[in-house]
Amino acid sequence: MKYLIKTLCVLAVLSLYSCGESDSPSGGKPTKPAFAKGADIGWYTEMESKGYKFYSASGVEMDCPSLMKPLGFNSLRFRVWVNPKERWNGKEDVLKKCLRAKELGMKIMIDFHYSDFWADPGKQNVPEAWTTYDLETLAKAVADHTSDVLNTLKDRGVDVTWVQVGNEVTNGMLWEKGRVNDQSASGFAKLFKAGADQVKAVYPNASVILHIDNAWNMDTLQWFYSLMANNGVKYDMIGLSLYPSYWKDEIKAFEPWEEKVNQAVANIPQLIKSYNK
């Protein structure tokens, strides 16, 4: 049966970031940091190359990043692939998008997939150039790739606020060496640390995000983040994807989305309390 994704919400920055408190500049009552409202528009350069154009509600043509600001967005996420078959989401394409975001004064999240194409809970394929690597060599490749991309951005004056070390890594990344299951997460922990250490080396103030899916499923969330704690995985923020509604052929409609959204929202304060993130 073919399922159609209706919605993807990345909740870590869009929700958890707004929940903590920081000291007031005047020394008074602590204030909450500004809410980060963001979107992943990593596909827009490819769309532009194919002739797609973007317009405001009033019909004014704008480039996609510029269109985000009047819609109330202040943050953008860009995914990174290692050696994509086409240039999209490779280092130079990501740099171009980040420079545009910088011009607009928007905060930036970098999302490392550590793959040549999409990585998600159902596929975490090792980049073709890395397929013969053992765990030690793979960890070095993760570190080198992370450092290379981030230093390229930093050298061009781009500031990065958040970095995802892996994308939807519920079942690990860089399979099989970095697979996560009930028996083991040690390989993943080593690979994640290799990436996270380089994030802090290049951007010491950037938040390292540990990102999984199924924000509505508290059993999965507790299993995963407790397993990470037991394996000594260090990170700054929890990142969650939410797919609240899929197409159901038997009813010829999308399933109701409200229950999963409400459950995801209810899970966030519990995660903050349990894992101090």
Regions found by a protein language model. Give the residues of each.
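Alpha-helix capping/termination and helix-coil
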Residues: 232, 242, 246, 275-276
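Short, glycine/acidic-enriched loop or turn micro-motifs at the edges of active sites
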Residues: 114, 171, 244
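N-terminal substrate-binding region of glycoside hydrolase catalytic domains
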Residues: 29-107, 113-142, 148, 239
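Bacterial Sec-dependent N-terminal signal peptides
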Residues: 15-32
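Sec-dependent signal peptide recognition
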Residues: 2-10
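Hydrophobic faces of well-ordered beta-strands that scaffold small-molecule active sites
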Residues: 36-41, 76-78, 108-112, 161-165, ...
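Residue-level signal for short, function-critical loop segments
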Residues: 82, 212-214, 241-244
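Active-site cleft segment of glycoside hydrolase catalytic domains centered on the general acid/base Glu
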Residues: 90-92, 99, 120-235, 247-268
